[in-house]
């Protein structure tokens, strides 16, 4: 749970502020994000519709199938159960047409407007209206909002954290299970949850919470397993076998002429090292660290050296970062938010350079070259800046949170 000083700050803010403004701004921002990319360029949403549902037959996404009029066999979707269910159900609202993939993208993005509004609501309840608004207008978050369906997993994860803070443990476990069944990333939250219960000498409660979450997860997944186990398991097999991919630390190093040898082995070493450092942070802190704060650092460590850096990862990091920033005093918040803004700009620049680099290579030597063109070196430098600033922001946040805990402890002692 949150510290008493944190709870008092939030309660005082919530008495004075309503969430309406944050929700409205979030929804307006999400609508503008649709107009920024109204055809869904570089979005999995339109791509997966074309690969799996374009013939209007609405075939089960966790099956090997062939579209009408095609001879190419399509593999199951490489997403967890609930994401596949969402993309399948939404396909029923779109009639086959020449540009049906655009209609499908816009329908899905329109639903995301509502989800983004609810996300802002929970962020406000867990931090403050100002911080929720800052998240809602974060440029890199909006730029990546409709790349795929991650918002469907992020919202229940944040809801689970909120319910945990409210001591509604069973509901929290259920929504965390929903999040894991939608994306699987939130599984990393088990680390800060386990440490939280361990440091509070409540190991039995911790085992029950994690066990209950996994039971809920299993209950959500069993129907999919029974329908087509191979189709259901395809995502997990695909993720395990996935090679080092685009926009990762490994690719950026290669682009800059410093390839990392034995990348597959180094991938595991770096991840274990990063998670080990987070574990040290969680266990050696002067006070028990909240689930919200701990989940940010664990998620950051998990994403930092991922095999592939997908652009929507910034939504996970930004939403959790906002919750962690909420633990700081107003003065410390102001300082760290400046760095948060710089990090967001670097994320946006990196994402833009990534896509322009793809277009530059695709249309090189044609009559319609990309404009502007982004060279491999420019893309690599943008990636280096992005990764560096993300690490700097995270270290600065950890430093400020530790300093805040010490300040709160000394204030309490003096009082």
Regions found by a protein language model. Give the residues of each.
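Multi-pass membrane glycosyltransferase architecture that uses lipid-linked
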Residues: 2-234, 266-415
């Amino acid at each position: 749970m949150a510290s008493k000083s944190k709870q008092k700050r939030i309660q005082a803010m919530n008495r004075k502020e309503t969430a309406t403004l944050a929700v409205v701004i979030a929804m307006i921002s999400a609508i503008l994000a649709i107009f920024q990319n109204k055809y869904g360029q570089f979005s999995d949403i339109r791509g997966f519709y074309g690969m799996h549902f374009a013939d209007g037959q609405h075939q089960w996404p966790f099956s090997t199938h062939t579209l009408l009029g095609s001879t190419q066999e399509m593999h199951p979707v490489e997403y967890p159960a609930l994401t596949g269910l969402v993309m399948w159900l939404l396909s029923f609202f779109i009639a086959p047409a020449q540009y049906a993939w655009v209609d499908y993208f816009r329908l899905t993005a329109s639903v995301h407007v509502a989800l983004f509004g609810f996300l802002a609501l929970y962020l406000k309840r867990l931090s403050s209206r100002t911080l929720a608004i800052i998240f809602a207008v974060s440029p890199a978050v909006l730029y990546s909002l409709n790349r795929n369906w991650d918002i469907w997993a992020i919202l229940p994860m944040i809801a689970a954290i909120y319910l945990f803070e409210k001591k509604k443990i069973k509901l929290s476990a259920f929504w965390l299970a929903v999040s894991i069944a939608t994306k699987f990333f939130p599984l990393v939250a088990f680390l800060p949850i386990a440490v939280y219960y361990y440091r509070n000498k409540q190991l039995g409660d911790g085992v029950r919470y994690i066990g209950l979450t996994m039971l809920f997860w299993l209950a959500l997944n069993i129907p999919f397993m029974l329908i087509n186990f191979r189709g259901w398991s395809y995502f997990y097999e695909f993720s395990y076998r996935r090679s080092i991919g685009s926009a990762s630390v490994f690719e950026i190093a290669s682009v800059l002429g410093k390839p990392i040898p034995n990348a597959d082995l180094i991938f595991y070493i770096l991840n274990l090292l990063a998670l080990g450092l987070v574990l040290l942070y969680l266990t050696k802190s002067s006070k028990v660290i909240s689930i919200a704060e701990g989940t940010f650092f664990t998620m950051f460590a998990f994403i930092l050296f991922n095999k592939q850096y997908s652009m929507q990862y910034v939504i996970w990091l930004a939403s959790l970062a906002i919750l962690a920033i909420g633990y700081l005093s107003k003065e410390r918040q102001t300082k760290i938010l400046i760095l948060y803004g710089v990090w967001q700009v670097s994320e946006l620049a990196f994402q833009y350079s990534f896509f322009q680099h793809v277009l530059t290579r695709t249309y090189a030597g044609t009559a319609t070259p990309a404009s502007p063109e982004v060279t491999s070196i420019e893309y690599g430098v943008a990636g280096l800046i992005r990764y560096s600033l993300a690490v700097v922001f995270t270290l600065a946040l950890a430093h400020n949170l530790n300093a805040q805990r010490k300040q709160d402890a000394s204030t309490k002692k003096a009082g």
